[in-house]
Amino acid sequence: MRDKLTERFDRMMKVLFRQEGANLEIGILASEEAQDFIEAHSSVLNGSFRKVEMSETMRKRLERSNYVFSGLKTFHELNEAFPSLLDENGNRKTFERFLNDVRKIDETYNSNYLRAEFTFVQASAEMAAKWERFMQDGDRYYLQYRTAGDAKVRPTHAEMAGITLPASDPFWAEFYPPNGWGCRCSVVQVRKSKYPPTDHEEAMARGKSALEVDKKGMFRFNAGMEQKTMPDYNPYTIKRCKDCDMNNGNMKLVFVPENELCAACKLVRTLANADAKQIKKQAKPLQGTVITNNEFPFRFDKLIKS
């Protein structure tokens, strides 16, 4: 699959190389080549939970989440590759030199970062499937936070071990695992007669203390509750994305400001819902939109290590 991604990345770079002007056109995301790349990347993520049992509705929503995430990541890659079209003197490079110069982008995003993303999506999907089963029982049982119980457990995550609360407690909306890159924590149902509930305020305090390292608040989400593999605020978005109507499916109500990330996000979400011919028409007004958002990209390598 790595070779297929690189092959599609190269094809997408050919389309990027043909662009004229000083600004990256967001409409490139609707091109056949970009769509092939986004779908291939999304398919890799989907493969992480192919054997996980869940309802078809949940699976489709998680797969859609992967598509949106992959689309915004692709936007990032195009954004990073675009300046490499010109050499140090401002002259257009040959395609061979350009492709060689952007090869490190492919390696960084679609090998290094993808490994961490694959593991996170897999954990999110497994926990989303669990949440779906938990909801069938309502508050009949308590839910209890568990770590992997070995020497690799982060001390911060160990702070939450044993927290026991009803499924309806707001704690689970913020601190349901996975709680970071490579998090192996889980949640299980326990009998109310066997385990006393944790005080809500105490649980919230322990959760906030445990995730203090996540100062951006990226991992404060519940994959099962939101039916998404990745939080709306992730390395390829900005903080206010958490409260955007688009993330709640209200596409028609959204006012898209003069912001290239918002425009790209709306296009990607529309692409997830429509066929290519319709999208190519809708993408035309976005051509020429400038990509100059100072709020991203985050240093993803640092986030993985945190």
Which residues make up each language-model segment?
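N-terminal leader/targeting and assembly helices and adjacent pre-domain segments
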Residues: M1-D106, R191-S306
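A broad, low-specificity signal for short, low-complexity segments enriched in glycine/proline
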Residues: S42-L45, R103-T108, Y141-A151
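Internal glycine-rich, Lys/Arg-flanked active-site/core loops of soluble domains
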Residues: D87, F95-F98, R103-D139
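Conserved short secondary-structure elements within globular domains
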Residues: V121-Y195
